[in-house]
Amino acid sequence: MQQSGAPCDFSSSDSWVILSPIEQSIKRKIEAVGTPLKDWDINIYRGVLTGYNEAFIISTEKRDEILANCADDAERTRTAELIRPILRGRDIKRYGYNWANLWLINTHNGIKGKLDRIHIEDYPAVKAHLDQYWDKISKRADKGETPYNLRNCAYLEDFSKPKLFYADITQNLNFVYSDEYMFCNNTTYFIASTHTEQLQYISHFLNSRLIDWYYRTLSVQLGANAVRMFSIYVLEIPIPHEHETDVYKAYGLNREEIAFIESN
């Protein structure tokens, strides 16, 4: 089959798009050199589902108010540790983020056999805040053992480890590395690994113009430019194991191919 002079091969069971000869050459080189992310020592997780963001995701002003309402320094210290920064998909930029001064009340449900759930009785000021939303939080489906607790999250501890945040829907592929103990909401995913240098290395490629182009040959595009960052496609992105900082050189692109990517 041909369309606009571009040959296509539909013999593969993979997702397909119509590519020109130069695009086919670039795609082949990327896939020949790189190892798909699914074969790296990483995991991909989605952000936190609270079931009722109005209660559990708060502004800095509200956080300060809750801390001011703590009975003593011990409660204030516990509460400050419980309330952690949270990112949304729209906050994430390439290699950085614009934090909206939002915080998650992390009244987690624990991890079976490993970590006890949060007991709200230990956080009176937080309880007073959540009680204002009792009618909503008590009826939500996404809750833990009590309405005060968030739903189960087996990868809870990974939020405190090195990770790459990225948005669920984005105009350009934007990944940001963070080793801070912070959360993201359900418009965001993150790549987790215990290997800090590996994550930073992967980030260099994922933020490149070349991989942005390549990803669009895998995923379905939304509108003119946006794409959904489905894990099934992200895990197929090939990253070279050889530590080469020049992305184009790492994949063996020639001048014509580089010029093509730069012009897109």
Sequence positions of predicted segments:
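Polybasic, glycine- and aromatic-enriched phosphate-binding surface used to engage nucleic acids
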Residues: 4-238, 249-251
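Amphipathic alpha-helical coiled-coil/heptad-repeat segments
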Residues: 208, 241-264
